[in-house]
A protein has these predicted regions:
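A substrate-binding/cap region within the structured catalytic cores of diverse enzymes
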Residues: 1-7, 18, 22
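Second-shell residues forming the walls of enzyme active-site clefts
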Residues: 13-26, 30-167
Length: 167
């Protein structure tokens, strides 16, 4: 449940407070990351442990969960490990080309650096390396691995393409 980690369940309140916070931080030269894009407001479970399936209509998603991300501009955003069946019934947003391209990049007009949430979370159904590669293939610019397991990090270094230029 994201409610305890959010400003509100009301998308207008989230949009207004989010915009104020981002403006304040950026004015003070602090970078911000908006998360979890395209939105987890309608989720009823914690994606650290289980994959949220958000069965809302496209219209409801655009009016509620997706709305704050159109208002709150940042250079960085973190994807949601949730399934939105009305857009892509098979993949979490992190692994979905459809959601990243059509919803995040086009509808929300997000032009910044797109970062996956932690690829070792239980809400992703593949192994660590596969989760990382699928996130990059779907359109994430960076993948996060946050559990501190050095053995896993060593494996990832071998399969993740190196960044040799920024475009």
């Amino acid at each position: 449940d994201i409610a305890s980690r959010s400003f509100s369940e009301n998308s207008k309140v989230v949009s207004n407070l989010g915009r104020l916070c981002i403006d304040f931080y950026e004015k003070n030269k602090i970078a911000t990351v908006i998360k979890h894009i395209p939105g987890l407001g309608l989720s009823r479970c914690d994606s650290h442990y289980k994959t949220p399936i958000i069965n809302a209509s496209k219209d409801e998603l655009f009016k509620k969960d997706f709305k704050p991300f159109k208002v709150c501009r940042s250079l960085f955003a973190m994807t949601a490990h949730a399934v939105y069946p009305k857009f892509d019934p098979y993949n979490t947003a992190t692994h979905s080309k459809i959601i990243i391209k059509k919803v995040i990049r086009c509808h929300m007009n997000f032009k910044g650096l797109l970062i996956s949430d932690d690829i070792s979370m239980k809400s992703l159904k593949y192994g660590l390396e596969e989760n990382a590669l699928r996130a990059l293939h779907a359109g994430c610019n960076l993948v996060l691995h946050c559990n501190g397991n050095m053995r896993e990090m060593s494996k990832l270094i071998k399969v993740i393409p190196k960044i040799d230029k920024f475009t």
